Every structure is written in C-alpha cells, then in structure tokens.
From Swiss-Prot:
PANTHER family linked to this entry: PHENYLALANINE--TRNA LIGASE BETA SUBUNIT, PHENYLALANYL-TRNA SYNTHETASE BETA CHAIN AND LEUCINE-RICH REPEAT-CONTAINING PROTEIN 47
Family annotation (CDD domains): PheRS_beta_core (cd00769), tRNA_bind_bactPheRS (cd02796)
Cofactor(s) annotated in UniProt: Mg(2+)
NCBIfam families: pheT_bact (TIGR00472), YtpR (NF045760)
Protein family membership: Belongs to the phenylalanyl-tRNA synthetase beta subunit family. Type 1 subfamily.
GO cellular component: phenylalanine-tRNA ligase complex
Domain tRNA-binding: 40-153
Domain B5, chain residue ranges per copy: 399-480
Name under which the protein is recorded: Phenylalanine--tRNA ligase beta subunit
Cofactor note: Binds 2 magnesium ions per tetramer.
Catalysed transformations (reactions): tRNA(Phe) + L-phenylalanine + ATP = L-phenylalanyl-tRNA(Phe) + AMP + diphosphate + H(+)
Keyword tRNA-binding recorded: yes
Length: 810
C-alpha cells in the first residue's frame, strides 16, 4: 500500500520525521516499509504554457501541430501526438535544454527537432514523462490559475511515497488516516470537517434483503453534478500513490478510500431501473463489471441490484452499465458496511479482487461509514456542484466499541518487563484505546478495563492489548532478563483417566491405536482361552463369543493390513476382555459373578525394523524389540525397577511386578510378552512372525507411581568393567543382571554385550556364557582400584552363591 507523506500531513500537520526516521519508526511499529519513492520537482526549464491553436499535421494523421504561448512574446510551435490536446489547455512545456527523468528512470534532454517535416521546439509533457505518475493517456492538464511562463515546479511539491506492507490483522492501517494514528497521539489527529447529513429511513430508496451480509447501507442521491476532470490538487494526490485520475466523482471516491479506508461507489442515478437499490444474495445472472469482464453471479453472492438487474458486486466492484460518465448529471453515492466473510467468499468465487474488497475482506471501521459519506458528499458539492436530493440509511451500525480488560501484572509476566500500570494507560491512550474509568489508575491495580475503538477489529482479548503495550513501549526497550519459569509441585496422583495416559505413552512410542469389536468368531477365541463367554443369540458366526483378551482382535487387524499390502505394523488397543470364572473363583454377587471382565493393554509388532534402504540389510523385528517397548512403558510408569521378566517357555516370558500394600509385599502377574506360534498365525491367515504383549491395566494403575524423582548427575567419573560368566542354560540372563545390580549401590547399570552358547556336551552340564558390561560410580568420590575390586568381588561372589555362575576362563 502506497502512502504519501504530504497526504499524511493533512492529518498530522506536526509530523516532523525525516524520511529515514519515518521509515524506521513505521517498521518499528510493525508497518514494514518495503520501498521508498522520492518524487522530485521537474527541471526549471519545464514551464507552464497555454495551447493557443491546434491544427492537423500535414504529413501524419496521428500528430498535431500546437501553437503554445510560453510567455516569451512569440508562440512556440510544438508537434504533439497526445489525443487530448485542445486549444485553451494549460500544459507543462519542456523547453529546449530541459532534462527530464521519466517514471521508468530514463533520462533524456529536449532538443530542437523536425518531426515529419515540421519544426518542433520543445515537448508538451505527460505526467509520466515528468516522473510524476505512470499516466501516459494524454498530456498533463494544469489548473487555469497557473501563470504562463512560470516554472512548473512552482506549482508542485516534493513528496515521499512509502510502500508499506500491512499485515492481514491490521486493516485499520490501510489508509492515510490509519497510518497517521500510528504516528501521532490520538488527540493530535486533525479530522477534516464536513456538514452532518441526516439520513432518513424507510423512504423506499433502499431495500436490504440480506442483512447478515450487509448490516448497514446508506445511499445519497445528488442531482445536478457536472462530471469532468478533477482539480489539480486532487488528481495530484491520486497520482502520488499510483492511481490514474478518471473524473471528479470517481476520483473523490478513491480519495476517500485512501484517506479514511472506507470504500464508496457512485452510480449513474438515471441508469438505475426503478430508482432504487436492493441488496440481495439470490441473484443468478451474468454481470459486466467496471473492468469490462463478464462474471457469472451465483446464489450466495452479495449483489447490489436495481429494480431489474445487478448493478454492483457488493463490496467488490461496480457494474459498467451504471458507471459515472461525462454525461452523468445525477448520481447515487453508496457507503456501506459489508460482512468481511461474505465479501471474501464472493471475491474468491469470482477470482476478482479490488481496492474495496481488499479492505472489506479484512474489516473496515463500521463507525466510519457515515463520516466518510458526509465528507465525500461535501467534496462532490464543492467540486462537481449539484445538491443533495435525498439521503437514506438501512440497518444499524455495529457497536462503536468493545471492552477488554488488562492485568498489568500479566503484561509484565509476558514481556519480562516492569512497566507501571499508569504507563500502560498512557501508551494505549496514544492509539485511542482508553481506560473506561475516568479516575487515575494506581500502579497496584489488579485489572484495568479499556474501551477499544471500532477501527481496531484485531483487538479481541487481553493478549492483543499486551502486544500493543509491547509495540508502543518498544521492543528495544525491553531489558533482557532470565526466563521466569513457574514452578509447580509434581503431582503424585494417578492421572485422571489412566487408560488415556497409557494411550498417550503408546502413541509416543510410535504405535497406532486401533478400536475393534469385542465380539469375534469362536475359532479365533479358542486359540487363547477355553473359558469363553458365548452370545446366546449371535447374529452371525463372526460375532458368536466375547473375546477372552485383545489378542484375537489385534491379529485380525494385522491380517487385514497384510492383505492390503501393509506389512510393517506397530499397533495397540486398550479395551476389555471377558472370560468365565472357574466355579471355585465365583462369588455370591449374582449371575454376573460367573464372568470376569478385565481391562487390558495389548500391542503387536511385525515386519521390518526399519524402512528398506540401500545402505543396510533388511532386519525384521523380533521378540526383544517388543520386550524393549514394554520396558520403556514400565519405565514411564516408574515400575521398571519393581518388574521382573520370567521365562515361561521358549516363546513367552511373564511380567511380574512387586507391590507393597498395607505393609505386605506381594509379586503380581502383570502380563506376558510372546511370539505368536505358527498354529495361531495360520488361523488368522498370517504368513510372517508376529510378536504380542498384553498387560493388565487395572494392575498397572494400582502399582503406578506418578512423578519424577530428580537424581543429579554424578560429579565423579564412571568406571566400566566387563565380566564374562558361565552359568547353567536354564537360568535366565535377567536374573544375573538383577543380581549384579543388587550387589552394591555403586553398580549404576548392567547390560549384556555378548552371549555364547557352546551347546550340550555329553557327560557335562548344559551351560552358556553371558558377558556383562558394568558401570560403577560413587557419588561421594572417585573410585580407586581397591573400591572397584571390592564391588567386582561382590558381584562374582553373589553370582556363584545364588546362581552357580563362575567367571569364564580364557
């Protein structure tokens, strides 16, 4: 958006920034200046001339010979090709030797010339040839008040035009008034004065059928206007920001748009059938817009119509048929508030954007509609003549202000600042956001209510006001400070809904949750239990029993995915399993005591461990991958230290948790980890190994310990030692790990790094070698060799006495 500094000074006469200071300050306020255009005065040899005579060029149809009075006593002959030259026009004349710099940046010097056989001593200039605008439709026409022979620079002013990038949340800054509000205190803004217009209601001039899309609409009929070129000052204002003047009526609406940010539209009143305006959203017809493109209007688009057809797309663009022309004598001036969502939808559907839609889409000031209309009417009466025949309004203007509360302590907490409450009030008052209370604000106040003006549509809540305080106070004035982190006591309670907590952990472990039907086929359930709960009247063989656990349901999901080409799976489910109770375990609570319902967490993995890649061999997941997942789950529940993994058979290990309740310690069976056997895989039609784990949710919740106990890192070095034991094959390696950890508190961690099984030798007991890597550390000091040897001796002695394990001899 282009902003003229001279235009800004109409609103802020005291504006004292130099160009670089203004650019820096606007950017600092969040209105980034993308480019700066310095508009300089033309060469002194460009003077004011008056065309006295125009005659055709004898040798060229498109050229004309102009005799121009430049105040030198003799008329100057100039050959000109502009289509708009006429006798009596005041024009800029570049005399011999004048150096011109065009808008394009090209520089050229005027020299005597002979054009198609006719002498030409100078050039009648268009605005773009003088570097004043990009208008090249004809020569530049000057006011009659200009004195012949005087340098044109005398009647022009230097200006600086800023190209500002306005963010979507700041539609209030899409005008010169909006930018002026940023540069000066609210009370320093000078608003142009215009007579108050009394808009009547119910006169029949307006009918709004879609009040949601157009809550407020005004129409003013002005008769007896004279449409013609705009005064030089008005045309110059528009040229400075890159707009091409058209005629005085259209130029006034554009001037109001860029001054106040309120789009207006003028219709030729005699082209409106029925002399009335209807705003509706059910039109379905073709429409020729001002850009001479035909659009197909659809129901749902906000359209302004006369008694017969659409004459404008509401908030977007007017129609060509009702446009103001040189023959127009009576106009209808529209000033309205269109719903941003409605304009955005219509503009997007039609792929049509305009200066008006750009502002309506983002939100114009609803309280500015009437004032902008009044000022436009005053300008039209002054410049184009005529008189107001009627002025009518429909609907009500939205509320003028919003009330938003601000807590000074919250501001300083967010910004890391120490701004006083009274300073915050003063900062916000600069941009017309005023405290509701008229009393002086004390610095220890808890909350302050502010009245937000209607043009700040982006301010809805406290954090928006905090942003404004930071912006006005200056981000560069915020002193760097340590990050303040609020400290809250760690809750030791069980999460409000424990199954959801388990779900969040599993998702964090890269598993996908599935939801399955608890009713399954009997053949599938038989693979996992004989104590099945049968459905009395099953609707199909697929739904004849309740699942005893979640395994059959998960395996069905695995099979479905494999048949559809998805063979790498990590799935889990938290749900219920159902089994019959043995007679001995039933209570006396009624028929339901014959059944046992358990809440379970089940998980399966299958397929490749990692995606296929050129730099590594394919490896499938195995039993230990799933065991690792279970260990991570137990660790997050703070249960790993209390858990033990016991081998049930070659394919299954059990998970047991040591629990202490009421002073009694017990070992509870929490679940299993297993490789699904081949017979079960065949039942479910699976052709690759699947690994399954199942845990009792109720038991996990009972044993769960919330909270993280912080353990600071040791200040002293860690010592590593390796031990290789030979132990009977039937003893799980986990027992050796647990025993090593329990031997001495200075044993920080134990892990297996090698296993060697030499097989069975006749006449000798069956043994295997398990190599352990131990990390030792003492929090009270550095361990010397004597201390290290003592710990290692304890581990070796305990392994020998408890497990019959001996150190492997090399």
């Amino acid at each position: 958006m282009k902003i003229s500094v001279n235009w800004l000074k109409e609103f802020v006469p005291s504006l004292s920034f130099d160009c670089s200071g203004l650019v820096d300050y606007l950017t600092f306020l969040g209105l980034e200046v993308e480019d700066v255009f310095e508009q300089k005065l033309p060469d002194q040899k460009v003077i004011v001339g008056k065309i006295v005579e125009v005659r055709p060029h004898p040798n060229a149809d498109r050229l004309r010979i102009c005799m121009v009075d430049t105040g030198e006593g003799e008329l100057r002959q100039i050959v000109c090709g502009a289509p708009n030259v006429e006798a009596g026009m005041m024009v800029p004349v570049a005399t011999i030797g004048a150096v011109l710099t065009a808008v394009s940046g090209e520089t050229f010097t005027i020299k005597p010339a002979k054009i198609r056989g006719e002498h030409s001593s100078g050039m009648i200039c268009a605005a773009d040839e003088l570097g004043l605008s990009d208008d090249h439709d004809g020569v530049m026409v000057l006011d009659e008040a200009c004195e012949i022979g005087q340098p044109l620079a005398r009647y022009l002013e230097t200006d600086t035009v800023l190209d500002i990038a306005v963010t979507p949340n700041r539609p209030d800054a899409l005008s010169h008034l909006g930018v002026a509000r940023e540069l000066a205190d609210c009370n320093e803004i000078v608003y142009p004065q215009a007579p108050v217009i009394e808009f009547t209601r119910g006169g029949g001039l307006i009918e709004v059928q879609d009040e949601e899309s157009c809550p407020y609409y005004t129409a003013t009929v002005i008769k007896g206007v004279t449409v013609g070129p705009s005064p030089r000052w008005l045309a110059r204002r528009l040229e400075q920001i890159g707009l091409r003047p058209k005629n005085n009526i259209v130029d006034i609406t554009n001037y109001i748009l860029h001054s106040f940010g309120q789009p207006l539209h003028a219709f030729d009143y005699h082209q409106l059938a029925g002399s009335r305006i209807v705003v509706r959203s059910d039109a379905e017809s073709s429409f020729m817009a001002l850009n001479k493109v035909e659009y197909q209007l659809q129901p749902g688009m906000t359209v302004v119509c006369d008694a017969r057809e659409p004459v404008a797309i509401g908030g977007v663009m007017g129609g060509l048929h009702s446009a103001v022309t040189d023959k127009t004598t009576d106009i209808l001036l529209e000033a309205a508030y269109f719903n941003p969502a409605s304009v955005r939808k219509t503009a997007k559907q039609l792929q049509l954007s305009s200066d008006s839609s750009y502002r309506f889409e983002r939100g114009v000031d609803p309280c500015n509609v009437k004032r902008a209309a009044e000022y436009a009417i005053a300008m039209i009466l002054e410049i184009a003549g005529g008189n107001v025949d009627s002025a009518e309004a429909w609907g009500d203007m939205p509320a003028a202000q919003k009330i938003v509360s601000l807590r000074p302590k919250r501001v300083n907490a967010v910004l890391g600042s120490s701004i006083t409450a009274s300073r915050m009030v003063r900062l916000l008052e600069k941009i017309c956001i005023k405290a509701v209370s008229q009393e002086a604000v004390s610095d220890d106040v808890d909350s302050i209510a502010f009245s937000v003006p209607s043009f700040r549509v982006d301010i809805e809540q406290e954090i928006d006001l905090i942003e404004e305080v930071a912006r006005l106070y200056g981000y560069n004035n915020l002193e760097p400070a340590p990050v303040m982190v609020s400290s809250y006591p760690v809750s030791r309670k069980v999460p409000e809904y424990f199954p959801d907590y388990l779900r969040s952990i599993m998702i964090g472990l890269n598993f996908r949750e599935v939801l399955t039907n608890p009713l399954i086929r009997k053949a599938e359930a038989d693979c996992f239990s004989s104590m099945l709960v049968n459905v009395l009247n099953p609707i199909s063989e697929e739904l004849e029993v309740l699942r005893p656990n979640l395994a059959p349901s998960l395996l069905k999901v695995v099979g479905y995915n494999m048949r559809h080409g998805n063979r790498e799976l990590r799935l889990f489910e938290v749900a219920h399993g159902f089994e019959k109770q043995p007679e001995a375990g039933r209570g006396n609570e009624g028929p339901l005591s014959a059944f046992l319902e358990k809440e379970l967490l089940s998980m399966v993995i299958t397929g490749r461990r990692e995606p296929r890649s050129w730099n590594r061999q394919d490896e499938n997941v195995d039993f230990y991958d799933l065991r690792g997942v279970v260990e991570m789950l137990l660790e997050k529940l703070n249960l790993l230290e209390k858990s033990a993994f016991n081998i049930y058979n070659a394919r299954t290990i059990g998970i047991e948790i040591t629990s202490t309740e009421n002073g009694k310690t017990s070992v509870l069976k929490a679940g299993t980890v297993q490789q699904v056997n081949r017979e079960v895989l065949d039942v479910f039609g699976l052709d690759q190994d699947v690994y399954l784990a199942e845990l009792d949710v109720t038991l996990l919740e009972r044993c769960f310990e919330s909270g993280v106990i912080y353990e600071p890192p040791s200040k002293f070095p860690v010592v590593e030692r390796d031990l290789s034991f030979v132990l009977p094959r039937h003893i799980p390696a986990q027992r050796l790990i647990d025993l090593a950890k329990a031997s001495d508190p200075r044993v920080r961690s134990v892990r297996i790094f090698d296993v060697f099984d030499r097989g069975t030798t006749q006449g000798e007991p069956s043994t295997r070698s398990v190599a352990l890597s131990l990390e030792l550390a003492d929090r009270s000091g550095t361990m010397n060799e004597e201390a290290i040897s003592a710990v290692i001796s304890k581990v070796i002695d305990n392994a020998r006495s408890e497990l019959g394990a001996v150190i492997r001899q090399v």
